[in-house]
């Protein structure tokens, strides 16, 4: 089947939503799905689709009770997604989310840069403040871990990707969205697995897992590890002390101990120890002609201890607590001839107790919690002339509550609120470029959500919620002619999010989820570059985004599942000069389609294709740095047998090499491109 790509349209001229060929095709699939499902309701042709349970909002809900725009990948879905071994493999499939590839830039969600107001050196000097939160088993990763670190999908129970502000429930650094990853817990029966994979670009994966009881039905453990290696597709020159920048490696090791004492009914506790490390080039942008590519190398490492408690006190109340302590470090190594090293060592701690109440008749569901977070990190920037010591300290205290009340049998009202107080310190000890920032700010983050369910399987709702990103300070510099650093401060950013959502389930085989949104920003933080080359973070007067996400799944038969998702987006902001522009990396349309097909005796075929519309690389909206629309297609064939599965897959099946981002506004050669096609295979054995 041929894929029809839209002709290139000037980004500057394409100022309106256009539901062109791709939209029409997808909407046709939606409506065609409804018609078929309603008229072909025979048990031998259809399979009842499972109901997804969402866990990332601190309360378990079905997808039909969840107002957030969220993509859910359980373990089975991850295994059946072509070539999915790390979180980036999933992010590239989500409409209204742009993941440009390996670089300083984290994904944008609904046009909002998940990296925060700055990336690279400016972010390092200012103290990073991302808008996208990524957590693994309750611990939120740092900016450098999200951008450069390991995010393995091995032995993951579920991954949830939230589009839109999550500040009211997740707290700091979630104004763009959140990625919640939950690994598998120990089991009270023995299970184990090993996996080996190989692929082009010298890719390899070696992974294993074992889970077993120690005391039957009381004490159990689980151990898992994953190592993935590959070579960068960009030709890079080796230098000391970094070695070969082409070599990319990530390692994850996790151990869990689960205790459910028989003498204490309803109580369970889990202790988790995990280590993650990675190394690779800071960016995989193509080489500029005539220059040797002495690309900086980033190495990250972290060790985390997490202790979780769940105690069902009685039929009404449940107490939970999550405690996390982590050590982390990351090091940037550069060519000594143009040295710009950066080293960080840090620690963080948080504790989050919760109390839940659920009425016996289910009419009231209440959550009350508190959170204390503190982190400290010591940084050092080292150039050819000197070293610049820096340090940062953050403390955040918050209390939050959520109440869901059944106003009538068909109307539910959800009220939530979070009060957060955050202290941020940033210090640079250099006598010429001294920075001493110490500010405390408070914010109240409310949410109101009203859902109407006239009949089972049909829900309509509206919600309003507030998000924020903390204030801060940093050191500005000149990108054209470096003459030193200049200290500056920027204010807190806030966002009001309004959404209308629907959830539909037809004949137990068709699912349609929609979210229409409008986001209004106050004092949006954005990197600004003056005509003279000065780079710093400033607060904008006006910014807004609006659009929609539409998703559908159709269990056409007991062996065939089809899905299609569409994202629409419009963004605008007013520069400090007064000019109105579009936000960078904010395509007006993005989409994906795919299928899962079981056939023969144990064979599975899965494929997907994702489309990303044209967008600008930078806030100036220059046509010179505009990105053409692009596709990526993936396919996988698996054979499932009694004790495992064997898989053959291809990512970027058509070997598309479109540009995804221009990293510099000084030239058009410094650009990221799609990773080339990779064909690989893996074998997993279960015992």
Curated annotation (Swiss-Prot):
Keyword Signal on entry: yes
GO biological process: iron ion transmembrane transport; siderophore-dependent iron import into cell
Induction per the UniProt record: Expression is up-regulated by low iron concentration condition. Iron-regulated expression is repressed by Fur.
Domain TBDR beta-barrel as annotated: residue spans: 189-687
A GO CC term attached to the entry: cell outer membrane
SUPFAM superfamilies for this protein: Porins
Highest taxon in the source lineage: Bacteria
Subcellular location, principal: membrane
Reported consequences of knocking out the gene: Cannot bind or utilize exogenous ferric vibriobactin.
Signal peptide: 1-37
GO terms, molecular function: high-affinity ferric iron transmembrane transporter activity; siderophore uptake transmembrane transporter activity; siderophore-iron transmembrane transporter activity; signaling receptor activity
UniProt keyword Acetylation present: no
Record's keyword terms, sorted: Cell outer membrane, Ion transport, Iron, Iron transport, Membrane, Receptor, Signal, TonB box, Transmembrane, Transmembrane beta strand, Transport
Pfam family for this entry, one: TonB_dep_Rec_b-barrel
Residues covered by the TBDR plug domain: 62-184
Function: Involved in the uptake of iron in complex with vibriobactin, a catecholate siderophore synthesized by V.cholerae. Binds and transports ferric vibriobactin across the outer membrane. The energy source is provided by the inner membrane TonB system.
Protein name: Ferric vibriobactin receptor ViuA
Gene name, Swiss-Prot/TrEMBL: viuA
